[in-house]
Amino acid sequence: MNFLIIGGDAAGMSAASRAKRHQPDLDVTVLEKTADVSYSACGMPYNIADPDRSIEDLVVRRAEVFRQKQGIDLLTGIEATSIDPAVKSVNTRDADGQARTFRYDTLLMAPGAAPLTPAIPGIDLPGVMVLKSLAHGRAIKQFIDQWAVRKTVIIGMGYIALEMCEALRERSIAVDMVKPRETFLPWMEARLAEQVKAEA
């Protein structure tokens, strides 16, 4: 019995670990297109705020630990390109462009979310970044250090945007925030939102 999981982020690895605990003889394979698994994504803004900390401090468990200690076949750098439910197979491609097909008895899709980027001119220019994965966190931290960044603009006012604003201010980087909606912090109670706005 082969349990195949597409996506090695929090949901995918939790499912893989739980499946092995309940059925130790189950063959569990996880396909992750990035090089990173099992890291504290919520800690990225706080890590970026501290220039003395390595972004690698956020890694909770390396891929080889899942293989050696839990018997989970975790393959990184492999992207699923198509699924054929009729024959229960997933076609993939690795970073070198090599194709490979995986068979499954049960398939779980856990690819995670992708950041929304507005369709505006210049969105693909150097220095325009998103924060979703550990690779994004690495790139942001490296860019700040390499270019001695002193001013940034953040599009959005969700939780991560606000945490990044605070993190950048900790590093003495000026921040302008652009809100896509007319109301300030629409997901927050109005009186509290006004208090946050007054103190910002």
Predicted feature locations:
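Beta1-alpha1 glycine-rich phosphate/pyrophosphate-binding loop at the start
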Residues: 1-73, 165-191
